[in-house]
């Protein structure tokens, strides 16, 4: 029944203020004594007062109304506690023997109910794991479902088949300022073509890639704005150059080959250089370093026909790549030279790799050993046909950090050795890369040795520096290059990392950029991702009397990532060119020496998107 009662404190406070009600406590306050055995003083401290007109009681239903005293309440609570303790002991005994836990009681506590459901789901999942898998024939499910995964993609339910169609477009706008020596005619040490403000497409590619029968991957990609010089051995002219479709990736690979890993055959990037292996879709700056242009991919767009093996240890912190390639000097994926075989290898170690690469330290060494490609050095001025016998020769040259034209031979050349004959070439590369949240660091060093080198009658080019007289033996020629760069995401993103080729992967903004008016005509904006970067760049093509020039450059970059597939670059670059040219006369005597040294300042912006 409902009991109207009052509890009034009668301790010392009541004695100090007789007749004053100090506290009103409902009967449920008896729970305060449930945690310990009752004491006589507890009852003495409370006085049950009958309801009076000037002091009404609180009429509330209570669970304690059936108890006659606090002692009875305490006894009931203690009995309940003993029962709970017995249940807990029983539960522990059952769990120790591996039995199923007791079902959770229906409780008002949602968290307890959720935990019980999770335990039940886990138990069901373990039972499902023990069931034998339904028999499935690889390749039997050819139905593809479409989705968007950084591009349009169709994939089967069992992932045996996949087709992805995409591409990339990069449009540049650049402006330059250069010292007077660099604006001289090219046969007097100046740049050729002369630097000029330019708008052009840097890349425009279409790509189709996919998977078939689970273990076979393939890729086909073509570049539609690549410039090609049909006479690569001579100084390029507009007559010999034009925009022609060139192949980049065109390969088939087999995955999970025992003891080998992945075996890839076709036109592809050879595993030499971190920057080289990183896709142009998410380069840190508008252009790769001087080292890339001079050593890693001159004249072939960075892609070579060959075979490559990619593998790693079980933990994935050690990876290796090795391959045999043809040293082609054209972007069409073929070589008709009897020389130019090239063996390339790369070994990577990740002493630190945490949080899927958001914190990592990457150390690697790469090497190339090759016979220079056999090529002709003289051509008929009327027919353009080669004259004489081909020789094994190499040309080292580099363009600027900001380009003044589409890719190909018509860009201004900053450093150039001319054509050098040699019997063998070895190259070495060192990589040091770090990532820590929004911060990233990237650096590489390259060295190249050309053995039994001698100058050729094909030199000098109009763009090359000083060479000794044609036919002069200069022994082993050593050239080197390197760069170091630091980048920081202002909006807190972190670089992603791929363990397939051990390089940075696509960065993803926390929030995509947008700007629109809502229903209240207020402008809503999301910033996308913003990244700043600084790079120092170095190239030395001076050695053994062959002086192709020395370049020191500094690039400041600001990258705005609108979404994972679109970004805008802003680059400012200043490069100092240390260069001199000595054209040779027809009688084999040196002509006048010209100084082509000076500063080049360039500003470039690029809108790049891929799909």
Regions found by a protein language model. Give the residues of each.
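Outer membrane beta-barrel
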Residues: 147-373, 379, 478-524, 529-544, ...
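Sec-dependent signal peptide recognition
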Residues: 20-27
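Outer-membrane beta-barrel pore domains
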Residues: 139, 193, 238-240, 253-254, ...
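N-terminal secretory signal peptides that target proteins for export/translocation
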Residues: 1-19
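Serine/threonine-rich, low-complexity intrinsically disordered segments
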Residues: 5, 12, 27-29, 62
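Hydrophobic h-region of N-terminal signal peptides that target proteins for export
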Residues: 28-36
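N-terminal export/targeting leaders of redox proteins
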Residues: 36-39, 542
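N-terminal periplasmic/intermembrane-space "pro-region" immediately following the signal or transit peptide
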Residues: 38-170, 176-184, 235, 494-518
């Amino acid at each position: 029944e409902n009991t109207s009662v009052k509890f009034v404190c009668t301790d010392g406070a009541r004695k100090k203020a007789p007749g004053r009600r100090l506290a009103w406590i409902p009967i449920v306050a008896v729970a305060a004594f449930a945690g310990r055995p009752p004491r006589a003083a507890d009852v003495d401290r409370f006085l049950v007062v009958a309801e009076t007109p000037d002091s009404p009681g609180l009429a509330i239903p209570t669970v304690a109304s059936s108890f006659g005293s606090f002692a009875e309440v305490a006894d009931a609570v203690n009995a309940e506690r003993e029962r709970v303790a017995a249940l807990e002991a029983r539960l522990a005994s059952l769990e120790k023997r591996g039995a199923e836990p007791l079902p959770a009681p229906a409780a008002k506590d949602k968290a307890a109910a959720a935990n019980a459901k999770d335990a039940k789901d886990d138990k069901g999942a373990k039972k499902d794991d023990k069931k034998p898998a339904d028999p499935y024939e690889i390749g039997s499910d050819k139905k593809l479902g479409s989705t968007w995964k950084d591009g349009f993609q169709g994939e089967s339910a069992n992932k045996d088949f996949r087709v992805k169609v995409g591409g990339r477009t990069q449009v540049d706008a650049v402006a330059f300022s250069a010292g007077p020596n660099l604006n001289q005619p090219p046969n007097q040490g100046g740049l050729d073509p002369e630097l000029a403000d330019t708008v052009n497409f840097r890349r425009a590619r279409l790509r189709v890639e996919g998977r078939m029968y689970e273990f076979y991957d393939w890729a086909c990609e073509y570049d539609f704005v690549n410039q090609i010089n049909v006479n690569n051995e001579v100084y390029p002219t507009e007559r010999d150059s034009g925009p022609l479709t060139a192949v980049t990736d065109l390969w088939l690979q087999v995955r999970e080959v025992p003891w080998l890993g992945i075996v890839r055959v076709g036109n592809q990037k050879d595993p030499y250089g971190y920057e080289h292996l990183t896709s142009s879709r998410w380069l840190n700056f508008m252009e790769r370093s001087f080292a890339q242009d001079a050593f890693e991919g001159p004249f072939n767009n960075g892609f070579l026909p060959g075979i490559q093996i990619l593998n790693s240890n079980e933990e994935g912190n050690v990876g290796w790549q090795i391959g045999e390639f043809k040293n082609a000097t054209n972007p069409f994926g073929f070589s008709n030279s009897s020389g130019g075989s090239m063996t390339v290898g790369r070994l990577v170690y990740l002493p630190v790799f945490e949080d899927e690469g958001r914190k990592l330290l990457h150390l690697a060494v790469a090497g190339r050993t090759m016979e220079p490609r056999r090529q002709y050095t003289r051509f008929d001025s009327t027919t353009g046909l080669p004259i004489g016998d081909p020789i094994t020769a190499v040309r080292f040259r580099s363009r600027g950090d900001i380009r003044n034209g589409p890719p190909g031979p018509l860009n201004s050349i900053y450093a150039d050795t001319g054509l050098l004959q040699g019997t063998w070439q070895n190259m070495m590369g060192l990589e040091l890369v770090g990532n820590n949240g929004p911060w990233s660091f990237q650096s590489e060093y390259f060295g190249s040795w050309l053995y039994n080198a001698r100058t050729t009658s094909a030199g000098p080019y109009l763009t090359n520096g000083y060479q000794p007289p044609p036919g002069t033996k200069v022994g082993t020629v050593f050239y080197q290059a390197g760069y170091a760069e630091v980048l920081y995401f202002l909006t807190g993103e972190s670089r992603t990392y791929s363990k397939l080729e051990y390089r940075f992967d696509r960065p993803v903004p926390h929030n995509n950029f947008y700007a629109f008016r809502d229903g209240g005509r207020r402008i809503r904006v999301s910033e996308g991702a913003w990244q700043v970067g600084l790079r120092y760049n170095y190239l030395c093509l001076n050695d053994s009397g062959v002086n192709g020039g020395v370049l020191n450059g500094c690039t400041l970059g600001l990258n705005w990532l609108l979404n994972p597939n679109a970004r805008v670059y802003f680059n400012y670059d200043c490069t100092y060119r240390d260069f001199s040219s000595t054209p040779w006369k027809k009688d084999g005597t040196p002509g006048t020496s010209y100084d082509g040294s000076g500063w080049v300042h360039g500003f470039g912006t690029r809108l790049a998107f891929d799909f």
